[in-house]
C-alpha cells in the first residue's frame, strides 16, 4: 500500500485555487515557490504530499507535516534529532521493504537541516530512481522528492536543496 502511495501520491486538496504557476499554498500553512512554472496534479491524503509536474517532465512531490503527528515523534527532540528520526523512519522503511528497492544515502547535512537520499526500484518494467530531501522547518517534517530519468543528479540535488532552502516558507 505504501509503495502505491509513494509512487502515486495524489489526491484532491486546496492549492490556492490554481492548477499551474510557480507559487502554491499547501496545507493552508506553507508557501511553496518553484523556480519555474509547474502544474499541480493532486495531493495524497495519507502522506500529505502534493504532486507537481514541470516542463522537464519531472515529478516533484512536496509535503510539510506537523512532526507531532508522526509515529516516530518524541517530545523534547531538537531540530537535528527530529530530522534524524524522520530520515531514519522513512529510510528504514524502504530499506526493509519487500519490493527490492535499493536505498542509498546521498549526503547528510544536519547542520543545514536536511538529508538527501535515494530510492531505486523496478516498477512495471521501468527503473524508477527517486531522489529525496528530508528536512525539518519550524518543527514540521519536510519531504521533497523528484523523479526525472533525463535530469543529471547534480541538477536534481540543486533543485531539491534550493526548493528546501529558498522555496518553502511559512505563510502569514
What are these regions (language model features)?
Residues 3-13, 17:
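Sec-dependent N-terminal signal peptides
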Residues 18, 38, 140-172:
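Surface-exposed amphipathic alpha-helical segments
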Residues 18-48:
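N-terminal "mature-domain start" segment
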Residues 28-29, 113, 125, 139:
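Residue-level detection of beta-strand-connecting loop/turn positions
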Residues 34, 79-82, 86, 90, ...:
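Stable alpha-helical elements in mature extracytoplasmic
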Residues 36-38, 66, 120-121, 146-148:
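A mature extracytoplasmic/lumenal domain signature
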Residues 46-134:
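Conserved polar/disulfide-associated segments of primarily extracytoplasmic proteins
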Residues 131-143:
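C-terminal charged interaction modules
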Amino acid at each position: 500500500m505504501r509503495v502505491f502511495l509513494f509512487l502515486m501520491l495524489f489526491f484532491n486538496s486546496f492549492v490556492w485555487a490554481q492548477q499551474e504557476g510557480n507559487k502554491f499554498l499547501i496545507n493552508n500553512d506553507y508557501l511553496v515557490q518553484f523556480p519555474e512554472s509547474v502544474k499541480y496534479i493532486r495531493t495524497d491524503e495519507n502522506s500529505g504530499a502534493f504532486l507537481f509536474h514541470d516542463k522537464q517532465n519531472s515529478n516533484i512531490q512536496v509535503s510539510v507535516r506537523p512532526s507531532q503527528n508522526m509515529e516516530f515523534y518524541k517530545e523534547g527532540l531538537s531540530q537535528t534529532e527530529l530530522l534524524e528520526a524522520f530520515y531514519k523512519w522513512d529510510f528504514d522503511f524502504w530499506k526493509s521493504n519487500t519490493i527490492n528497492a535499493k536505498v542509498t544515502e546521498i549526503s547528510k547535512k544536519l547542520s543545514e537541516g536536511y538529508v538527501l537520499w535515494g530510492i531505486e526500484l523496478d516498477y512495471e518494467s521501468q527503473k524508477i530512481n527517486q531522489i529525496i530531501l528530508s528536512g525539518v522547518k519550524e518543527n514540521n517534517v519536510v519531504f521533497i522528492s523528484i523523479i526525472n530519468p533525463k535530469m543529471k543528479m547534480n541538477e536534481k540535488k540543486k533543485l531539491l536543496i534550493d526548493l528546501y532552502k529558498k522555496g518553502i516558507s511559512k505563510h502569514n
